[in-house]
Amino acid sequence: MIRYPVTMTSTVRPRHRQGPARLVGGVPYSDRASTLSLLPGAAVGRWLARQAPLVCGRLLDLGCGNQPFLPWYGPKVAEAVPVDAAPARGVLQVDLAGPLPFPDAGFDTILCTQVLEHVENAEHAMGEIARVLRPGGHALVTVPFLYPTHEAPYDFQRFTHHGLAGLVRRHGLEVAALDAQGGPVLMLAHFGVLALTQVLRLLRLADNRVLRALVAAPQEALRSRVSTRLSLPARVASLGYMVVARKPL
């Protein structure tokens, strides 16, 4: 693991700091101390676990926050480069709206989870992903669709599965896999937990450990059943979509 010194840019913005993912049977799940809604993270985590054979070599964790997925990808790669627009210890701070400070074809794997909605020009960002990815390499990209505004005012857009696939293809990458972050049921469950979270905050009970455990328990029980299949219902209503983008040889 190589960590780069922080380089200041003109873009300094706050970012939600998700705790390290918990590995359960090789699946990275959301840190329960960081969020009350665990099901979206379960969808992304289960999907990432299926892509594990593609994770290798030199990895770029683009928009990494505080690297919640490091426990998952760390043992799989020879080197990881963490990059984010917000300052964090051991993370290279880069304005994601500009060019990435890396040469062409420098990474075997790129991880970009729930980041592109926070970049005003997603076309530019995907172009940079394609540029720094080596031929034959894979980019694992997840984006939201029917998802509440977050990290305002740095929340600019949402993506349908058609939009995500088109974004990838326009920059010369192949869609090796396209999946969903659950369907309508998961989406409604997530919104229900968010509503409950707001009630607990109004009552100043959001940090109550007993209540947090009660909210988490049913989600923990259901996390292994979360589907990431791009089913017909999920094509219409999903929290988001996930793509494996491959750069042709």
Model-found features: residue ranges?
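Conserved N-terminal segment of class I S-adenosyl-L-methionine
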Residues: 1-105, 109-111, 235-242, 248-249
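S-adenosyl-L-methionine-dependent methyltransferase catalytic module, highlighting the catalytic core
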Residues: 34, 120-124, 128, 138-248
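Short, cationic motifs built from Arg/Lys/His that form the positively charged side of catalytic pockets
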Residues: 40, 131-134
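Glycine-rich, phosphate-binding/catalytic loops in enzymes
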Residues: 76-80, 98, 127-129, 156-159
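Conserved functional loop/turn residues at catalytic and ligand-binding sites
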Residues: 101, 106, 114, 137, ...
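A short SAM/SAH-binding and catalytic strip from SAM-dependent methyltransferases
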Residues: 108-120
